[in-house]
From Swiss-Prot:
Protein family membership: Belongs to the nucleorhabdovirus type-2 matrix protein family.
Organismal lineage: Viruses, Riboviria, Orthornavirae, Negarnaviricota, Haploviricotina
Gene: M
Organism of this sequence: Taro vein chlorosis virus
Gene Ontology CC annotations of this record: host cell endomembrane system; membrane; viral envelope; virion membrane
Protein name listed in UniProt: Matrix protein
GO molecular function list: structural constituent of virion
Amino acid sequence: METPIIPSSSSLDRSGNSSNLLSVIPFQERTDSIIGCHFTLEIKAYHPDMMKSSEEGDVTLGSLYQGIHHIIRNKECQGLILGMDATHENKLHILALAFLCVIRKYEGKVSTYIERSKDTFSGVEQLLARIHIGDDHLGTYDPEVYQICGVEVPQGTYQLTLRTVLTPHNHTDGLSITLGIIVNSPARGMQGRSPMGVDVKRLILSFPKGTDPWTSYGEIKDKKGAVSKLKSILF
């Protein structure tokens, strides 16, 4: 895990002068936001091979991103909910942004809270891997604070839930994924807390070959309940 990036002040620093920012982001392109995130990532494996891979930690966030990217690109997303505004493009942007934070936090592994069980009705055995970062009092503070390098996030609270099923090649039933996200911009209650730095360009290079995420970063813009159309994000 890298050393957290320390902001030059408690407010959003958009000057690009902080010596702590990673040099991979060119000076003229730096637009940094300090956001707070709550995550719930739940992965259920049904196929024996996928259950074994989950137990051994072989299922990575990168491989999940590859499957999610494929589904989004083919417009097969189900269960997307966004609180701030309802445009499809903005949902994908927030999903990708939050997923970068998840990858940054867990460095690819999802083998947390592993439990085998049987479905109450069908009797089918399944394996549950669940990651949760959060608190019951979500309006009080953000349990994880991130400094996002290169992507500006307008002020507001974004709520997103993605539920989908990924079916691996030659498997009749594979992984069921629920990704629940709350993003607060700016982060709340962060006095004395150092945000973790999320270097968008570095993380994009770590994604599996062929996913081609964020070929253009685009922007998120407030426009009275709508946002400008994003440019090639996740497509």
